[in-house]
Each structure stands twice: as structure tokens, then as C-alpha cells.
Amino acid sequence: MKTMKKYIKTAFFCSMYWLIVQLNIANLGTRIPDKYFRQKYIIFKSFNFEKHGKFWNKWFYVRKWKHKILDGHQLNQNIYDQRHLMTINTDEIEKMIIETKRAELIHWISILPVIIFNKGPRLVKYINIFYAMIANVPIIIVQRYNRPRLTQLLRILKRRGERHD
């Protein structure tokens, strides 16, 4: 019984830790000016093996589950609400590309706090590593899947000269 209480207490504190840390990271991430995401940083580059996002769908079937991921705007009003995308024009697509970069960065950073559990009991460490991965990696994959497709759409719109709706 004493051991069970200890596990429940540990689970509660771990849950509170993740809630506070991830909400703060997301909040700070939304404050990064868009101009930083307009730069061409290597982390956001689509690599050859990704084949413009096709890799992610071939190996992880992204199209089948990406719509089931909770929209971050529901938890944090500062996060871009994709439902406001009423028209497809270059300005909106550029904003969506910026937001895929922002979301990817936020979720990479959100994995890092797992380091605090490094010295903890093995079970606690493994559970928290699992949580950090399962809560963040799917969102990173979706961003890496969507961004090349949005970039291609942006190229097409710019070629056609469709600047505004």
C-alpha cells in the first residue's frame, strides 16, 4: 500500500511537471517573432530522404492519423488557429509554413525537459521518456510532412501570381 501511494504521488508530480513545463514552452514559443522563422535554418529544411514529405506518410501513415491530433489553439489561444484558413493565398500559406516551423521547434524543445528524470528511478525515467516522445514526436512528424507540401503550394501560387484572395 505504501508503494502504491508512492507511485501515485510520483505520477501526480510528473504530470504536473509536464503540464507546467509544456504550457510554458508553448507560450514562450508563440512569442518568437515570425521573422526568425522566415530564415532558412537547417533544422527546418526538408532533407532528401524525406522526399518532400512522402517519407513520413509511407513509413508512418501520417494522412491516416494527423487529423486526430489536438489543435494547439484549443489549449493556448496564442497558437495559430488553422480553422481560420478560409482562403488559399500566398500570405496565408506563408503564415502556415511559419507556424509549422514554430510548432516543430516547440515540440523539439518540449522533449528536452525529460533530462530532469535522468537520475530518477528506472521506471519513472522510462515512463517519462515514453511520454515525452509520444506527446511530441507525432506532432514533429506532421510538421515535417506538411511543410514541404505547403512550400510546393506556395511556389505554385507565386508562379500563378495569386498574391491576394
From Swiss-Prot:
Q: Which residues form the signal peptide?
A: 1-28
InterPro entries documented for this protein:
CrtO (IPR044021)
State the Gene Ontology BP annotations.
Answer: carotenoid biosynthetic process
Q: Which Pfam families match?
A: CrtO
Give the UniProt keywords, A-Z: Acyltransferase, Carotenoid biosynthesis, Cell membrane, Membrane, Signal, Transferase, Transmembrane, Transmembrane helix
The transmembrane segments are 126-145
Q: Which pathway does this polypeptide act in?
A: Carotenoid biosynthesis; staphyloxanthin biosynthesis; staphyloxanthin from farnesyl diphosphate: step 5/5
For whether the record's keyword set contains Cell membrane, the answer is yes
Membrane found in the keyword field: yes
Q: What is its EC number?
A: 2.3.1.-
How is it placed in the membrane, per its record?
Single-pass membrane protein
Q: Its GO CC terms?
A: plasma membrane
Compartment(s): Cell membrane
What Gene Ontology molecular function terms does this protein carry? acyltransferase activity
Q: What does this protein do?
A: Catalyzes the acylation of glycosyl-4,4'-diaponeurosporenoate, i.e. the esterification of glucose at the C6'' position with the carboxyl group of the C(15) fatty acid 12-methyltetradecanoic acid, to yield staphyloxanthin. This is the last step in the biosynthesis of this orange pigment, present in most staphylococci strains.
- Similarity remark: Belongs to the acyltransferase CrtO family.
Could you identify this protein by its name?
Answer: Glycosyl-4,4'-diaponeurosporenoate acyltransferase
Q: Which gene encodes it?
A: crtO
